[in-house]
A protein has these predicted regions:
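N-terminal and secondary-structure boundary signal
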Residues: 2-5, 9-21, 27-375
Length: 375
């Protein structure tokens, strides 16, 4: 790995490479189908269609449950966490993106501090070192960045590949039979993916799938398996193949924790660039929407994508262009192919007596572009 590559250079190269390449039971049901018809491992050909959004009425299969709140605050986060916490016990890992130095869009630290103090006092935030050079590619630099960004003020972050790596099996994988993750990931009994939903230079969008698939893969081996593959180039994998490799990495972690896992996506400060871009991230244009939570990873990410697509044209165009140009919607279809969850769901509006709504109703009244919320 070229340790000298900078974060800014990473974002630029990622974009260039892509341009050149121009409820529980849901997942179990799908997994049973995959068990009957396993993904072929000899024909390593990426799927297609990652640039095409599939409307809700064109999807089939069972429905999961996704909770939704417009309350973008610590109180809103705690309220929605209560809806998905039932199976989170023992030693809990909270996987979130702690960001590059001074990253402007990461989840507000006071929200996470309140969640941990009131709901998860024995939990740890977990992270891994990065594949690219910057503020987090070594444990020493990573810890300095954690101080800079305010995480060290209230918790100790477990950098899970600090003490080595471990291999987790990838059920029904096309690209992998196993994935390399930070060894300390195995020290936890349950897992909460607390994700800042936003765009991504290579992934198109970063939801729970990206947070886990890239964020739990260790910096030296796992991330290289995803990004480089057999190409011989540091950033040689992109578009549908990248989405599939990332998703298989996620599958390794999700399968390891079984039903002891939940997913929360925060749709706030949604730059087209990931928090790995730090201060070089493009300005936020897409307006804030709210928070979703589910025990179904596909349904959680799909609901966020649906909410973005339900926005007015001028509000969504930048983020939608990023998603479609990177063929990122293959993340969703491949999670379904892998038996990881449902792309259909009941969206429960916890702000209004648990009324079942759709994405259009969730974003009703949102127009224009992003306005800072003061957090």
């Amino acid at each position: 790995m070229n340790k000298g590559i900078s974060r800014r250079r990473f974002v630029k190269l990622a974009g260039t490479a892509i341009a050149l390449a121009a409820l529980p039971g849901c997942g179990a049901l799908a997994a049973d189908e995959n068990a009957k018809q396993p993904v072929k491992t000899k024909e390593k050909v990426a799927g297609t269609g990652g640039e095409h959004y599939v409307p809700y009425n064109e999807r089939s299969g069972a429905e999961a449950v996704v909770y939704f709140t417009r309350d973008l605050s610590a109180a809103g986060l705690l309220k929605i966490y209560d809806r998905v916490k039932a199976n989170l016990g023992g030693k809990v890992a909270i996987k979130l993106h702690t960001g590059e130095p001074h990253g402007p869009n990461i989840i507000p630290r006071p929200w996470v501090k309140k969640l941990m103090a009131d709901k998860l006092p024995g939990a740890n935030i977990i992270e891994t070192n990065t594949y690219y050079g910057g503020g987090r590619d070594t444990t020493e630099k990573h810890r300095e960045t954690l101080k800079t960004n305010g995480w060290a003020d209230f918790t100790t972050v477990d950098i899970t590949d600090e003490h080595g790596t471990a291999m987790l099996p990838v059920p029904h994988g096309k690209w992998f039979t196993e994935m390399s993750v930070g060894k300390d990931t195995l020290n936890y009994d349950s897992f909460l993916a607390l994700t800042h939903f936003k765009g991504h230079a290579m992934g198109g969008f970063g939801g729970s799938n990206k947070n886990i698939g890239i964020g739990c893969a260790d910096g030296q081996i796992g991330k290289k398996m995803i990004h480089a593959g057999d190409s011989g180039s540091q950033w040689g994998v992109n578009q549908e193949e990248f989405m599939e490799r990332m998703t298989e990495s996620t599958q390794a972690v999700v399968s390891h924790f079984k039903d002891k896992i939940a997913f929360i996506n925060v749709m706030r400060n949604m730059s087209v660039d990931c928090d790995c871009a730090g201060t070089s991230a493009k300005p936020v244009v897409t307006p804030n929407i709210g928070i979703v939570a589910s025990v179904d990873i596909l349904a959680a990410d799909q609901a966020c994508v649906d909410c973005v697509y339900a926005l007015p044209a001028e509000s969504k165009k930048d983020l939608v262009e990023r998603m479609e140009s990177r063929h990122s919607l293959r993340q969703l279809s491949y999670m379904k192919d892998m038996g990881m969850g449902c792309d259909r769901y009941q969206l429960i509006d916890i702000d209004n007596g648990d009324k079942v709504i759709n994405a259009q109703e969730a974003v009703k009244g949102i127009k224009g572009t992003w306005v800072p919320d003061g957090n």
